[in-house]
Amino acid sequence: KIDQNEINENGVATYNFAIGTQTVGSKYKFTDESMLVETAREIKNMGSNLLKFSMHPRYCTENYGLPKNVAITSLTKLATLEPSVKEVLDMDFKYYHIWIYGFSQYTPEPEGEKDDTAQIKFINGYSKKYEDDLYKEVYDFTSHLLKTYNGSGKVFYLGNWEGDWHLRSDYDRTKPVNPKTLKGMTRWAKTRQKAIDDAKRDNNYKNVEVYHYIEVNLV
């Protein structure tokens, strides 16, 4: 006979058995809820205990079409002041994969235009100022997750969209990678990793985890 308490203690009950999906680039919805909330609910209804979505300065123009709030100037403020983002973070998901891009790294594009380099600042090199600003923003956001979801059992994986295309922002895979961009992206990734590690070192928490990951696709 299987003992349910033993299953829970061994973590089997929270293992991610379901092949999941992500709520990025959704094109339609059926309810009055925001795109982010509706798609998160449907992913949960599919049986998934993992939600993958994005958090970045384009929250009001890309993917979810959430209302712009000038008070939202960081990832932490996006997590606390934007109701739909807070709602999905509070949902009953065990695992979160989140593409995070710092507000401190963003150069707004002209209205109606999209430039994927606008959210990263390591093309052709990475300045110390942007590095320091990114560290603080990711450190603060990680601290927020650890404090807010302390004891929840949630696991957060903070990462990036397809990193290969950050190295080749012109989408030409036949060209050699710019060595300065490669070094810049390496510093960018290490900064994010260090910010998360330091926040975990400096905060008291239990039964909640935050990890850094790097996503690639040209493999």
What are these regions (language model features)?
Residues 1-32, 46:
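Mature N-terminal, pre-catalytic/accessory segment of carbohydrate-active enzymes
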Residues 9-21, 49-52, 93-97, 155-158, ...:
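Structural preference for beta-strand elements that scaffold enzyme active sites
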Residues 17, 28-61, 82-99:
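Catalytic domains of carbohydrate-active enzymes, especially glycoside hydrolases
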Residues 20-27, 56-58, 101-103, 161-163, ...:
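Active-site beta-loop-alpha junctions enriched in small/polar residues
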Residues 23-30, 65-75, 118-136, 177-183:
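The substrate-binding groove and active-site-proximal loops of carbohydrate-active enzymes
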Residues 39-43, 47-49, 56-78, 185-189, ...:
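Hydrophobic alpha-helical segments at protein termini of multi-pass membrane proteins
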Residues 78-89, 96-142, 169-171:
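Active-site-adjacent "subsite" loops/lids of carbohydrate-active enzymes
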Residues 96-100, 129-137, 142-161, 167-219:
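Noncatalytic carbohydrate-binding groove/subsite architecture in carbohydrate-active enzymes
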